Amino acid sequence: MVKGNSWCDKNIKVVATGSNDSGVSWIVEVEGRRIFHAGDLNNWYARFLTDDYEGGTIWSMEFGEIDPQKDEKQYLGELKDIRKIADSFDIVLFPVDGRIGNGYTRGARQFIEQFQTGLFVPMHFVASGFKSAWRMMEFTEARQIPFWKIEREGESINI
């Protein structure tokens, strides 16, 4: 599926929403719950948006030529498009990937600031360690949003 497409049957509805990276993100409605799965949607270059960043294109050994402000604008644009479909989710699965470097929670925080969020489930953090995802707990708890503190691979939860 591509952004804007949807599929449903008598049990589930799936809407493909955008991404500023590969693939799409998803809104899934099942058993009376609305779930958002971000896929690779994130503010991936947040670490470059520092006080000394003067705007425009920069060179990164890891990524080559990038424009962090342009990427953030694209990311926020995708959030705006998602908001046209839904402004609240019972469950949100979102990348909290410490490999991004400083600012790696920025995308998740921006999402939570724009959407009413039930349970927050971090993802894409195994390479940077489970504790790297826990950094979002203080932010979610301050907003009274439950956070699934995943502590090992294969862990599951009943919702």
Features from the language model and the residues they span:
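Core dinuclear metal-dependent hydrolase active-site scaffold
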Residues: 1-87, 152-159
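Binuclear metal-ion centers of metallo-dependent hydrolases, dominated by the metallo-beta-lactamase
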Residues: 1-7, 104-159
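Structural recognition of the beta-strand scaffold that forms the well-ordered cores
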Residues: 15, 36-38, 90-95, 120-122
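Small-side-chain structural scaffolding
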Residues: 16-19, 23-25, 92, 108, ...
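Catalytic metal-binding/acid-base residues of hydrolase active sites
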Residues: 42, 95-99, 124-126
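Conserved protein kinase catalytic core
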Residues: 46, 101, 130
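A short, acidic, amphipathic alpha-helical segment used as a generic capping/interface helix at domain edges
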Residues: 77-82, 102-110
